[in-house]
Amino acid sequence: MPKQTLDGNTAAAHVAYAMSEVATIYPITPSSPMAEIADEWAAHGRKNIFGKTLQVAEMQSEAGAAGAVHGSLAAGALTTTFTASQGLLLMIPNMYKIAGELLPCVFHVAARALSTHALSIFGDHADVMAARQTGFAMLSSASVQEVMDLALVAHLATLKARVPFVHFFDGFRTSHEVQKIDVIEYEDMAKLVDWDAIRAFRQRALNPEHPHQRGTAQNPDIYFQSREAANPYYLATPGIVAQVMEQVAGLTGRHYHLFDYAGAPDAERVIVSMGSSCEVIEETVNYLVEKGEKVGLIKVRLFRPFSAEHFLKVLPASVKRIAVLDRTKEPGSLGEPLYEDVQTVLAEHGKNILVVGGRYGLGSKEFNPSMVKAVFDNLAATTPKNKFTVGITDDVTHTSLEIKEHIDTSPKGTFRCKFFGLGSDGTVGANKNSIKIIGDHTDMYAQGYFVYDSKKSGGVTISHLRFGKQPIQSAYLIDQADLIACHNPSYVGRYNLLEGIKPGGIFLLNSTWSAEEMDSRLPADMKRTIATKKLKFYNIDAVKIAQEIGLGSRINVIMQTAFFKIANVIPVDEAIKYIKDSIVKTYGKKGDKILNMNFAAVDRALEALEEIKYPASWADAVDEAAATVTEEPEFIQKVLRPINALKGDELPVSTFTPDGVFPVGTTKYEKRGIAVNIPQWQPENCIQCNQCSLVCPHAAIRPYLAKPADLAGAPETFVTKDAIGKEAAGLKFRIQVSPLDCTGCGNCADVCPAKVKALTMVPLEEVTAVEEANYNFAEQLPEVKVNFNPATVKGSQFRQPLLEFSGACAGCGETPYVKLVTQLFGDRMIIANATGCSSIWGGSAPACPYTVNRQGHGPAWASSLFEDNAEFGYGMALAVAKRQDELATAISKALEAPVSAAFKAACEGWLAGKDDADRSREYGDRIKALLPGEISQASGEVKDLLLDIDRQKDYLTKKSIWIIGGDGWAYDIGYGGLDHVLASGANVNVLVLDTEVYSNTGGQSSKATQTGAVARFAAGGKFTKKKDLGLMAMSYGYVYVASVAMGASHSQLMKALIEAEKYDGPSLIIAYAPCINHGINMTYSQREAKKAVEAGYWPLYRYNPQLAQEGKNPFILDYKTPTASFRDFLMGEIRYTSLKKQFPEKAEQLFAKAEADAKARLEQYKKLAEG
């Protein structure tokens, strides 16, 4: 049986592909890779056990995927799907149907937390526990090897039992963990298949040659009996699963049972658990048993149907106390599901055993051997705590167990490494390659696990790698490391990088610093650790190499090469060969240029790696005096700072609000300093157009106006020039960047229209101190009121952006649109945001990029789910309209009351203009100013009325409702709701950030994806044309619709936004957003949008129903006949060139079709414009 190094998702996909004929799919983290892998294999013609290629169909949602599974099963095809979290919840209605009809299938679930008070993409069992009542059998895998083996068990057992299965494993901890495992080959799987059961399944299919009816409506006289008729199948299922497990054991030599026991044969204290925790608990149990403790573990494999007989069979007779661990929370219940099952079994069978239950690991919270020890210690207590939590500090309801002892249970001889990377720098990908190289080319076992934060890029990634001669069960993070690598120098001093490094260990740093500079650059505590632990210290300037070669910020291959050179895991010459082989495999479809650059990176890394010889005096390095910290809000000190220092696990429950509310305007405190280069203003070249500010994805560069008198005390480097324009006469102008908030994308410099660029990119290190002082001075300047037209680029950019310093990718094409909307309407905006990229860069705790102006006003932002965002926003609009109507009623009554003439005039003005933003604000401000005096003079009912108006005064200014999301939401999963909301006529504004892929889940195709584009779920290129969402919305006749592209036309974008917001009805703005998933250089993302329009790839138009009411043509075509080559545009993006490289004939056909579709679309729009 061959060994391969792969992750849990790949293991599941390997089996599902073999055993299925059809897969209906939809992306959701962390299950998406299963579907992506299946789609890619199908695109390349891989055969399953039936000798056929799996038919893969992407659906519009998980509900659609489950419905298609149901239909495919009903028609006689063995069908599977892959999902997690909210996706599984959307499948539940169909799961009841599939189970009720006894249709055999397997849903593979990378178990993940559900959205409650907050979204979490990380792992626990909340989703699968929500599906436990559907009638699906539920089989749990604890490791990557188990995923391979038990996936096969599930597929084999469902055929025999006719009961459908959920095969689940922990999201990220198992789905993304890389392990060296035995791979079951397809011909061996086929030998175990019950072919008679497959034939019987097909004979039961819907077939007009042998028709039958299913899915009837039943009355009270027979429904109950029919429901009970399936009992024998569920009673037989545990025995069938046990039988199949024995069959698989005969093939693999690995024995599984419905419940497996590990530990002392005479154990008195036992933990019952399932999922990856079992690996941690078993490792700990082995450690404790060696020390003489009578402890054990029962691993739950088959959770549904729960077999009391099989559970009791493995329970040692000596057991006195049991702790049941659940990785889910059921508020209001007497206990979590597994706990209640165990209690029931023991009570029904008269077992006098004390049982306590506890929760652990919610949202991928760390669960390690020290915590396992705490659970066993609790069981040993005189009165064990019940309904406990472990892994957190609960200082509110005091459920948590104390961790009294920290233990190291991992096998001796295991080499442990930690790598600190920057999101999008390639560190995680390189480490996955390293694991595979070591796993596939040595006799060592290998494990890799990767920790991310939620920033789209630029966040911290920590890779945990283990290698050793013994199997690795350590499904927890490394706290004692042999090697630690820091791939970004900005982490030095920010994080305790060397915490837990072993004496004599290795420290690898990527920095521009020379050996001589290290003494001044490294903090004292780091120098002390290096010297006292006698570390081997290496440095390499990977950024310099990457930039010289042309790889930009991608330092992955360079750092991987450096690792192999110093780690001595395998001979360096062999490692270099394997690295270059992996480069071909990873980047081959991206072209020879990319390949050669990466080959050069390997060679340069070998030459550039330098060992740093440090003085013994570092052992006595003295800490510098702490810098004076400016006064900060309590939230920043107690929540944001600890979380950003990677100390969030230490925060107690009392730190957090129970409803998930977080303050706004907190990203400005992060100061991540992740850019390599930042823009520096050259005032003599600047024409003061403000385009740089407009396109900045992170609002890091802004124009400032100041009165000369206010510049007293400015830093010497704070150079200004006379402001241009009569509106700014007598004022000074400056463009200023926030150096530590800039991500260094370079779009500002690229779009600068000056003959000689007014912005030049310079190394952050060289200018940080100067530009930080300049920025701090600029921010404290008094606000200058100017009358620049806010409907222009220049005027809009003098308004404060109320979206700043988000976690979006450098060069992001989405954020500039939303930032601009906040500059135009932000102080009265309410935003409903669909789950997706924009909810992650816009709403990842603890730092909120939405902020407030100097009056304390700013966007109120909320996110519900992926599929319901339009309805969520519509509900907001209904509520706001209701509140404003109540206010209008009260103000109307005030007109009849004995109030002052001035107050009455203000009320009359407001009632006449309440639906106009400017007028409602003007008269609303008058009412607010007059209210205190009116209230003080009033009495009785009039005073009560005025107090009621005062309570509702927040609704005096007209609110602007915005529904924001990506194309995956608008074109696919949320389209039904979006269509309904647009059809309703409600006064809402919809902004679709169209990246033409599901950007948030990794770049899967949507109905916005263009013909011929290669995306995940469209590995062979997309065959169908892009859905024309705008044209569909125009068909109503009363929806404002615009298609815009910031990089192509600023003026058209400004017109569209202002017209849409002003329009009294639904508006839809579809915005082209270049994305890293397109395979472009994000320094030129704005330029890429311009090219898209010039080539006829993306249309610019506005459809304004208001014009039709004036007797004019409502459709305005804002782009001309293409002036550039459509094909050249496609060849500038890897999402298209990769198809040409892999499938040249197919590419030619699809590219021709895409171009023809674009031309046909333009002709259609021209006809609309002609009326």
Swiss-Prot record:
User: Per UniProt, where does [4Fe-4S] cluster 1 bind?
Assistant: C686, C689, C692, C752
The answer to whether the entry has keyword Iron is yes
Binding, [4Fe-4S] cluster 2: C696, C742, C745, C748
Q: What class of enzyme is it?
A: oxidoreductase
Listed CDD domains: TPP_PFOR_PNO (cd03377), TPP_PYR_PFOR_IOR-alpha_like (cd07034)
Catalysed reaction, written as an equation:
2 oxidized [2Fe-2S]-[ferredoxin] + pyruvate + CoA = 2 reduced [2Fe-2S]-[ferredoxin] + acetyl-CoA + CO2 + H(+)
Kindly list the positions annotated as binding pyruvate: T29, R112, N1000
A single GO molecular function, which one?
iron ion binding
Q: What does this protein do?
A: Catalyzes the oxidative decarboxylation of pyruvate to acetyl-CoA and carbon dioxide. The two electrons that are generated as a result of pyruvate decarboxylation are used in the reduction of low potential ferredoxins, which provide reducing equivalents for central metabolism. Also catalyzes the reverse reaction, i.e. the synthesis of pyruvate from acetyl-CoA and carbon dioxide. Appears to function physiologically in both directions. The oxidation of pyruvate by PFOR is required to connect glycolysis and the Wood-Ljungdahl pathway of reductive acetogenesis.
Q: Subunit arrangement? A: Homodimer.
Q: What is this protein called?
A: Pyruvate:ferredoxin oxidoreductase
